[in-house]
Amino acid sequence: MKETTKARIELLLAFTLILYILPLKHSVTDFGYWLDWALAIHDHGISNVYRHGDDVNYHPIFLYMIWLYDVLMPTREHIIANINYLKIFPLIFDFLPVVVLCCFRQRLIQEKIPYLFLILNIAYLFNSVCWGQVDSIFSSLCFLALLTTLYKPSLGVVIYILAFYTKFHSIMFLPVMFLILAYKVRSWRGFLQVVIASVATVTIVLLPFIIQGRAADVFNATVKAVDFWPRVSVQAYNIWFLLVWGVPYDVFDSETFFILTYKQTGLIMFLISSGLTLIPLTRRLLSLRLNNAPPDRALKQLLMITLGLICFNFFYFNTQMHERYIHPALIMFFFYAVYSKNYIPYILISVAYLMSLEKTFPDFLPIERNRILFSARAIALLYTSTLVYTMVIFYRQHRLGYELKELRKLLFQWHAKP
């Protein structure tokens, strides 16, 4: 049996099984909002959802999914009764990366992928299947967008814009997207193709709102989402659970932390840590561009761990973080393991993520929680250990002194090139 055929059968069976046992429980608060938005779309149309829905602060792509759900439901009563089936949308995107990479002929990743190790990971599925949140949608789109841009920049940009209009957090990967575009786009024609694809995608996504003169509503919703939870941490067991005495949720991030505010301090730590993480990838992409070389295995392995660390830094240092904002790192660390054969970062982050989700929703899994192991600071220490371990691996392989020296040489070579 061909590997692609085997993958299709196994993934179809896994998807069908998960659908069959799809939990009826979900986040009452989140689904309360989504039911309100679904009824607002049903009554007033999708272009008016930001004006009639209660606290609508999600981007259009997820709202289009709610609209599609509305279309499939014949009456208001069915919309209300079957709202739990909205979980199917994020579940589809949980499967999307491995379906694309394992069920079809492609050149994005040529390695053998143990896809069941991702798909049957309860930490990976919990966010979609139990909670019913939508982080898997933008996570999978960002992953596929950045990989695709290595070969087809215009298509990659289209996918990335879809990710951005699903969740604003996609912006954390924007510097990597710019670096890949700088490596891949080498002519004015290629640049124009990317620009046209970008403008066309944004226009299509916003078209219903543009037609009704409601495009500003989307922008206002994005602004509204910023500082929606102005707390030091919202159940994200990150560095602030180790630095703040008491409960970080009870502390506003506008308060002073030594000299700066908590928010400013977290943002600076994120920018510095992510900036250092980007140096090896920048050097590698510039080297490949100067040598007119195609993407290779080493680049993709470096890309995966870089993306995972950027997401981890975003979650670990910034304020206002929820526990589920680490979700994209699971995909990145899994595919880093596919290349490196080192599954330790993926396993560690899966354990920490599952513990944090289970602590947030203690009634979902039949787990007897140990008060010490499942304490907030214990989970924060596990996240810290995972980040430190992964950074040690990263900087052992890519020593900053060497990377900076080589980057300076390449920049001089690029500047001197006629």
What do the PLM-derived regions correspond to, one by one?
Residues 32-64, 68-77, 214-223:
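Extracytosolic helix-loop segments that constitute the early lumenal/periplasmic catalytic or substrate-binding loops
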